[in-house]
Amino acid sequence: IPEASKLVIDALADCQGGEIFVLKMKAFVLGQLAEAFRNVLSTGADFKVETRGIIGAEKMHEELVSSEEAKRLWETENHYVIEPIGGNWSPEKSMSKAKIEHFNSMDAEKFEGTELQAFINNYISSLNIQ
Protein backbone atom coordinates (compact mmCIF):
# COMPACT_ATOMS: atom_id res chain seq x y z
CA ILE A 1 0.00 0.00 0.00
CA PRO A 2 2.75 2.56 0.79
CA GLU A 3 4.43 1.78 -2.57
CA ALA A 4 1.14 2.16 -4.45
CA SER A 5 0.49 5.47 -2.68
CA LYS A 6 3.96 6.70 -3.65
CA LEU A 7 3.30 5.68 -7.26
CA VAL A 8 0.13 7.81 -7.30
CA ILE A 9 2.01 10.80 -5.86
CA ASP A 10 4.89 10.34 -8.34
CA ALA A 11 2.40 10.03 -11.21
CA LEU A 12 0.66 13.24 -10.15
CA ALA A 13 4.02 15.04 -10.05
CA ASP A 14 5.36 13.66 -13.35
CA CYS A 15 2.28 13.18 -15.53
CA GLN A 16 1.89 15.12 -18.74
CA GLY A 17 -1.23 13.33 -19.93
CA GLY A 18 -1.89 9.95 -21.48
CA GLU A 19 1.03 8.01 -20.05
CA ILE A 20 0.60 4.90 -17.91
CA PHE A 21 2.57 4.41 -14.68
CA VAL A 22 3.42 0.84 -13.63
CA LEU A 23 4.90 0.04 -10.23
CA LYS A 24 8.06 -2.07 -10.24
CA MET A 25 6.92 -4.66 -7.76
CA LYS A 26 7.94 -8.07 -6.62
CA ALA A 27 5.65 -10.96 -7.45
CA PHE A 28 4.36 -13.89 -5.44
CA VAL A 29 2.04 -16.80 -5.96
CA LEU A 30 -1.20 -17.06 -4.02
CA GLY A 31 0.13 -19.98 -1.97
CA GLN A 32 3.01 -17.80 -0.73
CA LEU A 33 0.54 -15.11 0.33
CA ALA A 34 -1.65 -17.63 2.17
CA GLU A 35 1.39 -19.08 3.96
CA ALA A 36 2.66 -15.60 4.88
CA PHE A 37 -0.72 -14.60 6.33
CA ARG A 38 -0.95 -17.89 8.17
CA ASN A 39 2.41 -17.16 9.81
CA VAL A 40 1.54 -13.52 10.52
CA LEU A 41 -1.96 -14.12 11.88
CA SER A 42 -1.64 -17.53 13.50
CA THR A 43 -1.76 -17.49 17.27
CA GLY A 44 -1.09 -21.17 17.70
CA ALA A 45 -4.61 -22.11 16.63
CA ASP A 46 -5.11 -24.50 13.76
CA PHE A 47 -4.96 -22.39 10.61
CA LYS A 48 -5.51 -24.51 7.51
CA VAL A 49 -4.87 -23.51 3.92
CA GLU A 50 -6.87 -25.48 1.39
CA THR A 51 -5.61 -25.78 -2.17
CA ARG A 52 -8.45 -26.12 -4.64
CA GLY A 53 -6.68 -25.78 -7.97
CA ILE A 54 -7.28 -23.42 -10.85
CA ILE A 55 -10.80 -22.08 -11.30
CA GLY A 56 -12.38 -20.82 -14.52
CA ALA A 57 -11.06 -17.51 -15.90
CA GLU A 58 -8.22 -17.46 -13.36
CA LYS A 59 -4.94 -15.94 -14.54
CA MET A 60 -1.68 -17.62 -13.65
CA HIS A 61 0.35 -14.49 -14.43
CA GLU A 62 -0.50 -10.83 -14.84
CA GLU A 63 0.82 -8.95 -17.89
CA LEU A 64 1.73 -5.44 -16.73
CA VAL A 65 3.63 -4.19 -19.80
CA SER A 66 3.11 -5.84 -23.19
CA SER A 67 5.86 -6.27 -25.78
CA GLU A 68 4.24 -3.50 -27.84
CA GLU A 69 4.13 -1.13 -24.85
CA ALA A 70 7.76 -1.99 -24.01
CA LYS A 71 8.84 -0.16 -27.18
CA ARG A 72 7.55 3.06 -25.58
CA LEU A 73 8.71 2.26 -22.05
CA TRP A 74 10.70 4.53 -19.76
CA GLU A 75 11.76 3.86 -16.21
CA THR A 76 12.69 5.44 -12.92
CA GLU A 77 14.05 3.69 -9.86
CA ASN A 78 10.59 2.66 -8.64
CA HIS A 79 8.30 2.51 -11.66
CA TYR A 80 7.89 2.25 -15.42
CA VAL A 81 6.15 4.83 -17.59
CA ILE A 82 4.49 3.82 -20.85
CA GLU A 83 4.73 6.73 -23.25
CA PRO A 84 1.40 7.65 -24.86
CA ILE A 85 0.96 7.22 -28.60
CA GLY A 86 1.12 10.57 -30.39
CA GLY A 87 1.17 13.99 -28.79
CA ASN A 88 4.04 16.04 -27.42
CA TRP A 89 5.06 13.81 -24.53
CA SER A 90 8.69 13.87 -23.42
CA PRO A 91 10.35 11.89 -20.62
CA GLU A 92 11.30 13.55 -17.34
CA LYS A 93 15.03 13.99 -16.65
CA SER A 94 14.81 11.27 -13.99
CA MET A 95 13.65 8.71 -16.59
CA SER A 96 15.77 6.47 -18.78
CA LYS A 97 14.72 4.28 -21.69
CA ALA A 98 13.78 0.86 -20.31
CA LYS A 99 15.59 -2.14 -21.73
CA ILE A 100 12.99 -4.86 -21.24
CA GLU A 101 10.80 -6.67 -23.75
CA HIS A 102 7.75 -6.94 -21.44
CA PHE A 103 6.92 -6.98 -17.72
CA ASN A 104 4.72 -9.60 -16.12
CA SER A 105 4.36 -11.37 -12.80
CA MET A 106 6.05 -14.51 -14.12
CA ASP A 107 9.27 -12.66 -15.01
CA ALA A 108 9.22 -10.11 -12.18
CA GLU A 109 11.54 -10.40 -9.21
CA LYS A 110 9.93 -12.71 -6.64
CA PHE A 111 9.56 -12.49 -2.89
CA GLU A 112 11.96 -15.03 -1.36
CA GLY A 113 11.64 -17.08 1.83
CA THR A 114 10.07 -15.06 4.64
CA GLU A 115 10.43 -11.75 2.76
CA LEU A 116 6.69 -11.52 2.00
CA GLN A 117 5.85 -12.25 5.63
CA ALA A 118 8.26 -9.49 6.73
CA PHE A 119 6.67 -7.12 4.20
CA ILE A 120 3.20 -7.85 5.64
CA ASN A 121 4.46 -7.50 9.22
CA ASN A 122 6.09 -4.14 8.43
CA TYR A 123 2.90 -2.87 6.83
CA ILE A 124 0.73 -4.00 9.75
CA SER A 125 3.18 -2.37 12.19
CA SER A 126 2.98 0.90 10.24
CA LEU A 127 -0.78 0.98 10.89
CA ASN A 128 -0.20 1.23 14.66
CA ILE A 129 -3.03 -1.21 15.37
CA GLN A 130 -3.03 -2.68 18.87
Report each predicted region and the residues it spans:
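Strand-loop microenvironment adjacent to phosphate/nucleotide-handling motifs in alpha/beta enzyme folds
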Residues: 1-130
